Amino acid sequence: MKNIFLHSLTLENYRNFKNLELKTDNTPIILTGENGSGKTNILEAISLFYPGRGLRSSKLTDICKTSEDYCKVKTLLQSKLGLAELSTHIKRSSNRRITEYNASKIANNELSKFTNMVWLTPQMEGIFTSSSTDRRKFLDRIVYNFDTKHAALLNKYEYYMHERNKILAEDIRDNNWLKIIEEKMADISNNIANNRLKTIRFIQQAIDDIENEFPKADLSIDGIIEQKILNVEGDIVNFIITELYKTRSKDKLLGRTSFGIHKSDFLVKHQKKNILAKFCSTGEQKAILIAIILAEINSTIKLTKITPILLLDEIFVHLDDKRRQYLMGFFNALNIQLWVTATDLDGIENFANKAQLIKL
């Protein structure tokens, strides 16, 4: 088993922190303090060492401390590749972010080579009633833990889709280049769709195998390409190429690509009630989301033999005692680094006894 964890975390001009340095090890870490003390800001800073825009999906200009033009986050990480120094620098005036590994620049999508990460925030509790884009991004973040190339595939797909839209919008008469772009999109789409389906199988198996205090969920993906793969309907890549060709005129008028894996939706059902999670109560939705996160943790550890870093923002809030006790036992048994925020330790004293406490 390979344990991934932060040895240290340094923030400079990050949100409400002028300077902050934390020393940590492979144990649970509880961040306590009043609302506004910066607990979630620390989780967000850690999440920047994973592909994407962090757990808040914030604009770069919002991250730097007010009145400062730059900010920096640095960590010494026990990573998949061994001991690694990672840093990310954000400059407000140029709206740029640079990520470095041992002082050499790397692409944001390369971060999955170093870490596995899972997070849960209160904002995610509305994911079942929000847009399909949010659910798709949630699924893709799960996929990153199983396939280190998935983030790069998504970036390439976005790039080629943008190029296709540009060619159609500007009425560039270059059918050969358009054909090449659509062929690349089709090949990448096939890989992305298969990665998503494979990951859903992993998580579903983990859900079915676990007996806990949370409702079981049925996971699926609603997308034309994924459905054809599941039905084993011929040459998927050629099918995508054909559909992209057929929708050129329509997409030229729309100014966007109307067909593709960027239209798929991640669907979640309450298994016992056989209804979509979006129709469940808010309490049930939070419980279902936690069930998926627990399955993701178990599946990631079991299949990759690599432990993820967990970022859990106010996870114990509004849970009944039985579920809170179950989670504390689950986390204590993991032997991994997890970061938990809480305004106080009421109700989680047993968990706190085995954790590193950081009061802000």
Curated annotation (Swiss-Prot):
Question: Which residues constitute the signal peptide according to the record?
Answer: none
Keywords from UniProt, A to Z, are: ATP-binding, Cytoplasm, DNA damage, DNA repair, DNA replication, DNA-binding, Nucleotide-binding, SOS response
Q: Which Pfam families match?
A: SMC_N (PF02463)
Residues bound to ATP? G33, E34, N35, G36, S37, G38, K39, T40
Q: Which NCBIfam families match?
A: recf (TIGR00611)
> Its family?
Belongs to the RecF family.
Q: What is this protein called?
A: DNA replication and repair protein RecF
Provenance organism: Rickettsia prowazekii (strain Madrid E)
The lineage, from the top, is: Bacteria, Pseudomonadati, Pseudomonadota, Alphaproteobacteria, Rickettsiales
